[in-house]
From Swiss-Prot:
The keyword Transferase is annotated on this UniProt entry: yes
Protein name in the entry: Pyrimidine/purine nucleoside phosphorylase
The keyword Transferase belongs to this UniProt entry's keyword annotation: yes
This enzyme's EC code(s): 2.4.2.1, 2.4.2.2
Enzyme class: transferase
Catalytic activity: a purine D-ribonucleoside + phosphate = a purine nucleobase + alpha-D-ribose 1-phosphate; adenosine + phosphate = alpha-D-ribose 1-phosphate + adenine; cytidine + phosphate = cytosine + alpha-D-ribose 1-phosphate; guanosine + phosphate = alpha-D-ribose 1-phosphate + guanine
Taxonomic lineage of the native organism: Bacteria, Pseudomonadati, Pseudomonadota, Gammaproteobacteria, Vibrionales
Record-stated family: Belongs to the nucleoside phosphorylase PpnP family.
Keyword annotations of the record: Glycosyltransferase, Transferase
Molecular functions per Gene Ontology: guanosine phosphorylase activity; purine-nucleoside phosphorylase activity; pyrimidine-nucleoside phosphorylase activity; thymidine phosphorylase activity; uridine phosphorylase activity
Stated role: Catalyzes the phosphorolysis of diverse nucleosides, yielding D-ribose 1-phosphate and the respective free bases. Can use uridine, adenosine, guanosine, cytidine, thymidine, inosine and xanthosine as substrates. Also catalyzes the reverse reactions.
GO CC terms, sorted: cytosol
Length: 95
C-alpha cells in the first residue's frame, strides 16, 4: 500500500511504501527551512538537488548533494535548509 504524506503546508510531500527490508518514503521538498522529528533511525539519500542539515549532534551545518546520504538517530530531530526543490529517499532503519 502507498501512503501519501504532506508536511509544512504542502511544501514537503512524500509517498510511503514497504518492502521486505523495511519502510521507506520518497519525496520532494520545496525551498525553505524545516525541522523534522524522528521516531526510528533514518537514512536520507538526496536523489536530486541538495539538503543542508544540522542534527542535534552537529556543531555546524552540512550540505549533502545528489547521491549522498546521511543518518539521523531515532527519537531525535534535525533542521533542514533547502535552497532548490530537492528529491529524497528516506529509509527507516532498525532501532
Amino acid at each position: 500500500m502507498i501512503k501519501e504524506n504532506v508536511y509544512f503546508d504542502g511544501n514537503v510531500k512524500s509517498l510511503g511504501f514497504s518492502q521486505q527490508d523495511g519502510e521507506s518514503t520518497v519525496g520532494v521538498m520545496a525551498p525553505g527551512q524545516y525541522t523534522f522529528g524522528t521516531g526510528a533511525p533514518e537514512r536520507m539519500t538526496v536523489v536530486k538537488g541538495a539538503l543542508t542539515i544540522k542534527r542535534v549532534t552537529d556543531a555546524d551545518w552540512v550540505t549533502f548533494t545528489a547521491g549522498e546520504a546521511f543518518e539521523v538517530a531515532g527519537n531525535s530531530s534535525f533542521d533542514l535548509q533547502v535552497e532548490v526543490a530537492t528529491a529524497y529517499l528516506c529509509e527507516f532503519l532498525p532501532a
